[in-house]
């Protein structure tokens, strides 16, 4: 029994993990609580049910990071990507799927494998023996959520995302912005320049507040009734409490001197903080929001220095369950306190169907290799897979860790290439060319 691989959760990650492990010759049991235990979002008991969008986003594997992830998954015999191709809908350069036939097909393919069994039952604890992958997604059941909290510590499991927008560093206008921590705090130069600052005049601030209050906003979905808590109040809710609230909160202008205009005191300052070790991504501090995406880009580009901002991720607050993976998981997604257990998918802090399935693919292969007594080299960081797993298991800042889509800001720079907009096409092609070579080389281990 201990040589079976148990996978809890039959979503994108769990289905992909099962497929990969089964094709390596390992016996797999998928534990899926639906339809016996329902969620507010799912409609069926099918595996890999898509409950939100039906899009896997861009399929461009030369100029887009998620398209590159598609390519890497296809190269690894991905169940999710193969089945998506079979049920593809017209969507321009994106990969959209007919969601019901897609889920039915994934379910049928897994059930047809002689070494895969689906057990429709809820798992409510973290076993101490056997090989397990927990891929329970953003709607992890309350009982299992409590078990994970007990094992990991309550402060390391979040039930609502407080997602601030993330901006590509190269798109920020540094002729208006500058690097400085408040009151120059810090022992090192890096600490004293940890924040990127965008100043506002009084007129700019008032116009920003007007736009913020008037912007289209989304409401909590049914089942997301816990409301807001002060630790992650949306900026528009803060603005509704008073026009000066933001100026005395995340946008307070104190302890900062604008080197571009040293004699002029800003009325308000928007701060951005480095979001990855490479310094290619910055998050807008305190700017979690329920504004609709189109409104976010319009409003946030009113910030001086961000007029041409390119966003790696837009903000939001919604129901989720995810670990502080940089603290809790090792480089193979094993729980450090219980290494017989791996986590995969959205619960690890990746965002999106494709990213979830990708982490399932890795977890399934890693768990199967462990069962078979096979050593694997680390996933190459220059691949999309490697950039993503490196981010969630150590590359991200643990104190501010939030779910992340795959994007080129997670990739190590390619030396000798132009920065900025003009060099972007060549730079992205260099990223994808390098990634494909690295990924194909890693696959030779199987």
Swiss-Prot record:
| Example GO biological process | tRNA wobble uridine modification
**UniProt entry keywords in alphabetical sequence:** Cytoplasm, FAD, Flavoprotein, Methyltransferase, NAD, NADP, Transferase, tRNA processing
- What does it do? Catalyzes the folate-dependent formation of 5-methyl-uridine at position 54 (M-5-U54) in all tRNAs.
Q: Which GO terms describe its molecular function?
A: flavin adenine dinucleotide binding; tRNA (uracil(54)-C5)-methyltransferase activity, 5,10-methylenetetrahydrofolate-dependent
Q: Which family does it belong to?
A: Belongs to the MnmG family. TrmFO subfamily.
Q: Does the keyword tRNA processing apply?
A: yes
Q: What cofactor does its activity depend on?
A: FAD
Q: What does the record give as the organism's lineage?
A: Bacteria, Pseudomonadati, Pseudomonadota, Alphaproteobacteria, Rhodobacterales
Specify the protein name.
Methylenetetrahydrofolate--tRNA-(uracil-5-)-methyltransferase TrmFO
The record's top EC class is transferase
- Native species: Ruegeria sp. (strain TM1040)
Give me the residues that bind FAD, please. Answer: 9-14
On the tree of life, the source organism's domain of life is Bacteria
HAMAP family recorded: TrmFO
Q: Which GO terms describe its cellular component?
A: cytosol
| Catalysed reactions, as listed in the record | uridine(54) in tRNA + (6R)-5,10-methylene-5,6,7,8-tetrahydrofolate + NADH + H(+) = 5-methyluridine(54) in tRNA + (6S)-5,6,7,8-tetrahydrofolate + NAD(+); uridine(54) in tRNA + (6R)-5,10-methylene-5,6,7,8-tetrahydrofolate + NADPH + H(+) = 5-methyluridine(54) in tRNA + (6S)-5,6,7,8-tetrahydrofolate + NADP(+)
* Protein localization: Cytoplasm
Main localization of the protein?
cytoplasm
What Enzyme Commission number does this protein have? 2.1.1.74
């Amino acid at each position: 029994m201990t040589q079976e691989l148990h996978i809890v959760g039959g979503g994108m990650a769990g289905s992909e993990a099962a497929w990969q492990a089964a094709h390596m010759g390992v016996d797999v049991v998928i534990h899926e609580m639906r339809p016996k235990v329902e969620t507010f979002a799912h409609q069926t008991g099918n595996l890999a049910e898509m409950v939100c969008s039906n899009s896997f986003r861009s399929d461009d594997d030369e100029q887009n990071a998620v398209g590159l992830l598609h390519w890497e998954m296809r190269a690894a015999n991905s169940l999710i990507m193969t089945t998506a191709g079979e049920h593809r809908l017209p969507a321009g350069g994106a990969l959209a799927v007919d969601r019901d036939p897609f889920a039915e097909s994934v379910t049928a393919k897994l059930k047809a494998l002689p070494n895969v069994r689906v057990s429709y039952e809820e798992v409510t604890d973290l076993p101490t023996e056997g090989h397990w992958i927990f891929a329970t997604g953003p709607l992890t059941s309350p009982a299992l959520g409590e078990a994970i909290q007990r094992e990991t510590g309550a402060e390391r499991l979040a039930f609502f995302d407080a997602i601030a927008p993330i901006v590509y560093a190269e798109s920020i206008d540094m002729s208006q912005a500058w690097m400085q921590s408040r009151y120059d705090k810090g022992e090192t130069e890096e600490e004293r320049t940890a924040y990127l600052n965008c100043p506002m005049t009084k007129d700019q601030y008032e116009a920003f507040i007007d736009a913020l209050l008037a912007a289209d906003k989304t409401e909590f979905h049914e089942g997301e009734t816990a409301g807001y808590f002060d630790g992650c109040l949306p900026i528009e809710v803060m603005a509704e409490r008073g026009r000066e609230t933001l100026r005395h909160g995340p946008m307070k202008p104190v302890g900062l001197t604008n080197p571009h205009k040293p004699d002029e005191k800003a009325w308000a300052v928007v701060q951005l903080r480095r979001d990855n070790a490479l310094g290619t991504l910055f998050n807008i501090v305190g700017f979690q929001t329920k504004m609709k995406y189109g409104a976010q880009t319009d409003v946030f580009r009113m910030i001086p220095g961000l007029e041409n901002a390119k966003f790696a991720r837009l903000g939001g607050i919604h129901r989720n369950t995810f670990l502080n993976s940089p603290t809790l998981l090792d480089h193979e997604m094993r729980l450090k306190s219980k290494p017989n257990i791996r986590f995969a998918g959205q619960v690890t802090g990746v965002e999106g169907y494709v990213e979830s399935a990708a982490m399932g693919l890795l977890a399934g292969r890693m768990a199967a290799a462990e069962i078979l007594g096979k050593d694997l080299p680390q996933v190459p960081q220059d691949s999309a897979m490697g950039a993503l797993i490196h981010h969630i298991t150590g590359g991200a800042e643990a104190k501010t860790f939030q779910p992340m889509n795959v994007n080129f800001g997670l990739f190590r720079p390619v030396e000798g290439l132009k920065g900025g907009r003009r060099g972007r096409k060549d730079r992205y092609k260099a990223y994808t060319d390098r990634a494909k070579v690295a990924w194909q080389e890693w696959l030779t281990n199987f």
